């Protein structure tokens, strides 16, 4: 029996018949008119019987009294024998009662076709599959380091909260929301983080806060706000830090984490807020070198004179805490850019007028005065991210986009 796996060549023949015939007529003519033509060794019936020639595939169509089509014959003979067999088929001149013309179109080398397909497929595999699976030494190192960091995780208390390896021995701890936050801090060498893992604060965290300096680093979303509110009620929190708006702690880069921790604010400024204003949010701090610049005509007093330009004793304030300390009890206001540069400094009583003269992005306001609902509404119209003020009175409706912090 012939096996397709042994095929070397495929003979393509073109057939034209002057009349109407069927496939069996064509097959019969092939066997009948080639019998004994090439001797016993190349007899078509014997070649099929021994599996050296495959089945004869006839494909014909009849139209207007004529029959046309192709004949395909697979062969495992060598090149010379296959060529001889193909040429013998061109001697067929009749099919049934009809005149026929048979011509060899081509002899296809199956192995060449297979090799071509193999090469094309190899190109596809090289471009597609190997692209994603390429070996990157940095990725391998990161994967190993990640596994080591996870191994360093500890479980504290009866609640088995996730914590870094230095939480017990360190004088200060950083309270985050979940396990992924602890791992991210470990990634950057911060080993004293502990996860609160929900609004139900574990007993071990309450105990740690009473013994150590506690700083919260929570997501700047509603969930982080609720967790902070719970922590402030049940634990002794010393400082509060926030992730950038719209970003969770587990997504923060090293620079963002360091900046947030460096700009932490005392928790007392949050704890002392009046109960009627519990919905006041806190500022998500950031930091950068400060540089004073003001638009022309901005920040003048009611008499039309510009307040004297401040000269700092050393370097300009670059963090929220420094700005808050600098304006405290001085009756001044500062509008800050996203990198905490001073855009404009004015009298605290002239915030409304200065606001009209500001151009560009204003990140926040630090002011030594009481903020009321009317002024807060005006600030909300400027897409200001935060307001730090001496106090907040009569706040009934706070713009959701503004976070408020009280200067202690």
From Swiss-Prot:
Domain Toprim: 171-250
EC number(s) recorded for this UniProt protein: 2.7.7.101
SMART domains: TOPRIM (SM00493)
Residues given in the record as Mg(2+) 1 binding sites: 177, 219
GO CC annotations on file: cytoplasm; DNA-directed RNA polymerase complex; exosome (RNase complex); primosome complex
Residues that hold Mg(2+) 2 according to the record: 219, 221
Pfam families per record: Toprim_4 (PF13662)
GO terms (BP aspect): DNA replication, synthesis of primer
Free-text remark on how the cofactor is bound: Binds two Mg(2+) per subunit.
SUPFAM superfamilies on file: DNA primase core (SSF56731)
Molecular-function GO terms, alphabetical: DNA-directed RNA polymerase activity; metal ion binding; poly(A) binding
Regions of compositional bias (Basic and acidic residues) in chain numbering: 302-314
Compositionally biased spans, kind Low complexity: 284-298
Annotated catalysed reactions: ssDNA + n NTP = ssDNA/pppN(pN)n-1 hybrid + (n-1) diphosphate
Stated role: RNA polymerase that catalyzes the synthesis of short RNA molecules used as primers for DNA polymerase during DNA replication.
Stated name of the protein: DNA primase DnaG
Species, as recorded: Methanoculleus marisnigri (strain ATCC 35101 / DSM 1498 / JR1)
Gene that specifies this protein: dnaG
